[in-house]
Amino acid sequence: EGADIDLGNNTFGGHEALVVFDNVFIPNERVFMCQEYKFAGMMVERFAGYHRQSYGGCKVGVGDVLIGAAALAADYNGVPKASHIKDKLIEMIHLNETLYACGIACSAEGKPTKSGNYLIDLLLANVCKQNVTRLPYEIARLAEDIAGGIMVTMPAEQDLRDDMLGPVVRKYL
């Protein structure tokens, strides 16, 4: 509350929704499955596979931005050529490109189905998901190391606007 810059992107940021269908008419031509329970598990598995495959692209875009920000922070801190900083940036790039490779692999190893759809490789999609549950956090940890503590302990906008704290924050940041 009382902040404009700490809100994130309220137009295009993430969102969740609860959708309730109560007494809704759905025309037959729009019904996807009707009492075909034996296919429900396969449908969920395939949906999850495509969702996991897409992580290989979307999380990597965020990683690219974070890697660029970490490199800029190293530059601002006057240490862009330090070997330990370069090693961390290289590791971040390696981890991020590993995620991308997982997304590409499960797509490239997919096969067409009899119905004309294209099914990604579900095993490799799960490998992609497993890497997505770990590697972005390691990339963020390395970015924190490079940027220094200010990246993770930066004062809030409310502190910046505070009559007593604001001048101190502005002096050092």
Predicted regions and their residues:
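Glycine-rich beta->alpha junctions and the first turn(s) of the following alpha-helix
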Residues: G2-N96
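Long, well-ordered mid-to-C-terminal structural blocks that present hydrophobic/aromatic surfaces
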Residues: V62-E138
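Short amphipathic alpha-helical patches
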Residues: V44-A48, E97-T98, P112-G116, P155-R170
